[in-house]
Amino acid sequence: MTLQHHDHQHDKACAGQCIFDTDLHHFERDVIEASHKQLVMVDLWADWCGPCHFLTPVLLRVIPTYDGKVRLAKVEVDEGDNMKIAGKYGARGFPTVLLFKNGEEVARFHSAKPEHFVREFIDEHLD
């Protein structure tokens, strides 16, 4: 269940780039460096994970409404070396969602959450 940039072309404020896949080799650029310009939410997920499939549509609805102030990096932990990202950040279960600002993790949540929770989670960290 890999997301492609073109799946989100309807999102004009983000020019289709607010929601994207990343991996271990691009994490520094896509998340850490990018978080100096805007919030970057990282969804650590797995295809076999039921709660991950519940959370994904919630995130896909919420992120585009922030007009480019928040980006969502999707990391499928079972692809390549991506589990190393989960290990580095101590993710014990999936989904785990991390929020980065100014190059640092500032918050996280675990498991599937409703839309209002995700909005409050983001709003707490917007400038």
Region spans (language model):
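Structural cue for short, hydrophobic secondary-structure segments
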Residues: 43-45, 99
